[in-house]
């Protein structure tokens, strides 16, 4: 078993960098590993058009570490009022690479999201025409639907219909959490792909709920039972190009997580590729990591692969108990615990 693993530099096809003072921390953590990242638009207010995307992009670029070539790939936040013209303008910008469907109320800062899928059909038609992928948070939000069933319900009620109605539209089913979602993506046409997070590969709902509630495992879509975790691992290590890396790294200040009504999100960007390496090693599939992390994503988006490389070494190190997050701190995934792989920094 090798103690070194060299990969083409990976990209993160789903990340939350937040805004303001937090960018000084989140951008550096992402840029340490990734060449590019699809940046989620659920700010307050959300990123709804090309002008707002450009302003956010400039704030991210200003926060890059010195000499970093990290490239933020911007995303529009779809609303009931997103027009075809806004889609075309965004595509023409060259820096907006996708548009995101948040069902209203599904997750953090999604209150401005889509209330009925039919309301965005005009925008989806334009996206199919110009070649802009649709990114989907795939959960229904009706109160009577159990939180553990909301992803499957979304597939049955909405996603099948969207894929059938817009056969040329690229669709990324983001942060899939169930065997149902993995099966749907496998069986769907080639224009449908999915991202999988490190935390959904490494953990299941027992980790969050057994022996006490652990708020830093709480995320949306929520961790599912271990059979779904195993199905996600099967998909990730399969070599199927429909599945690729998307951390959904989503930081919240400690006080917003460790509270009676805590926010959803796990912060993994600080050690993302190391965490994925652990998951793939569990399946004796480190040889499949480069495809999942570095090849499948750019191929799906029609972007060039990165040409530089990173190296991981088998070396134990302790994850920090907390990290700076703007004016506060964030408790990262695996805080205070031992990680088994370490990114070899440039020049080391």
From Swiss-Prot:
<feature type="binding site">
    <location>
        <position position="175"/>
    </location>
    <ligand>
        <name>Zn(2+) 2</name>
    </ligand>
</feature>
<keyword id="KW-0378">Hydrolase</keyword>
<dbReference type="GO" id="GO:0005829">
    <property type="term" value="C:cytosol"/>
</dbReference>
<protein>
    <recommendedName>
        <fullName>Dihydroorotase</fullName>
        <ecNumber>3.5.2.3</ecNumber>
    </recommendedName>
</protein>
<comment type="similarity">
    <text>Belongs to the metallo-dependent hydrolases superfamily. DHOase family. Class II DHOase subfamily.</text>
</comment>
<comment type="pathway">
    <text>Pyrimidine metabolism; UMP biosynthesis via de novo pathway; (S)-dihydroorotate from bicarbonate: step 3/3.</text>
</comment>
<feature type="binding site">
    <location>
        <position position="137"/>
    </location>
    <ligand>
        <name>Zn(2+) 2</name>
    </ligand>
</feature>
<feature type="binding site">
    <location>
        <position position="137"/>
    </location>
    <ligand>
        <name>substrate</name>
    </ligand>
</feature>
<feature type="modified residue" description="N6-carboxylysine">
    <location>
        <position position="100"/>
    </location>
</feature>
<dbReference type="GO" id="GO:0008270">
    <property type="term" value="F:zinc ion binding"/>
</dbReference>
<dbReference type="GO" id="GO:0044205">
    <property type="term" value="P:'de novo' UMP biosynthetic process"/>
</dbReference>
<keyword id="KW-0479">Metal-binding</keyword>
<dbReference type="InterPro" id="IPR032466">
    <property type="entry name" value="Metal_Hydrolase"/>
</dbReference>
<feature type="binding site">
    <location>
        <position position="16"/>
    </location>
    <ligand>
        <name>Zn(2+) 1</name>
    </ligand>
</feature>
<comment type="subunit">
    <text>Homodimer.</text>
</comment>
<feature type="binding site">
    <location>
        <position position="264"/>
    </location>
    <ligand>
        <name>substrate</name>
    </ligand>
</feature>
<comment type="function">
    <text>Catalyzes the reversible cyclization of carbamoyl aspartate to dihydroorotate.</text>
</comment>
<dbReference type="InterPro" id="IPR002195">
    <property type="entry name" value="Dihydroorotase_CS"/>
</dbReference>
<feature type="binding site">
    <location>
        <position position="220"/>
    </location>
    <ligand>
        <name>substrate</name>
    </ligand>
</feature>
<feature type="binding site">
    <location>
        <position position="252"/>
    </location>
    <ligand>
        <name>substrate</name>
    </ligand>
</feature>
<feature type="binding site">
    <location>
        <position position="42"/>
    </location>
    <ligand>
        <name>substrate</name>
    </ligand>
</feature>
<feature type="binding site" description="via carbamate group">
    <location>
        <position position="100"/>
    </location>
    <ligand>
        <name>Zn(2+) 2</name>
    </ligand>
</feature>
<dbReference type="InterPro" id="IPR004721">
    <property type="entry name" value="DHOdimr"/>
</dbReference>
<feature type="binding site">
    <location>
        <position position="14"/>
    </location>
    <ligand>
        <name>Zn(2+) 1</name>
    </ligand>
</feature>
<feature type="binding site">
    <location>
        <begin position="16"/>
        <end position="18"/>
    </location>
    <ligand>
        <name>substrate</name>
    </ligand>
</feature>
<dbReference type="InterPro" id="IPR006680">
    <property type="entry name" value="Amidohydro-rel"/>
</dbReference>
<feature type="binding site" description="via carbamate group">
    <location>
        <position position="100"/>
    </location>
    <ligand>
        <name>Zn(2+) 1</name>
    </ligand>
</feature>
<dbReference type="GO" id="GO:0006207">
    <property type="term" value="P:'de novo' pyrimidine nucleobase biosynthetic process"/>
</dbReference>
<keyword id="KW-0665">Pyrimidine biosynthesis</keyword>
<dbReference type="Pfam" id="PF01979">
    <property type="entry name" value="Amidohydro_1"/>
</dbReference>
<feature type="active site">
    <location>
        <position position="248"/>
    </location>
</feature>
<dbReference type="GO" id="GO:0004151">
    <property type="term" value="F:dihydroorotase activity"/>
</dbReference>
<keyword id="KW-0862">Zinc</keyword>
<feature type="binding site">
    <location>
        <position position="248"/>
    </location>
    <ligand>
        <name>Zn(2+) 1</name>
    </ligand>
</feature>
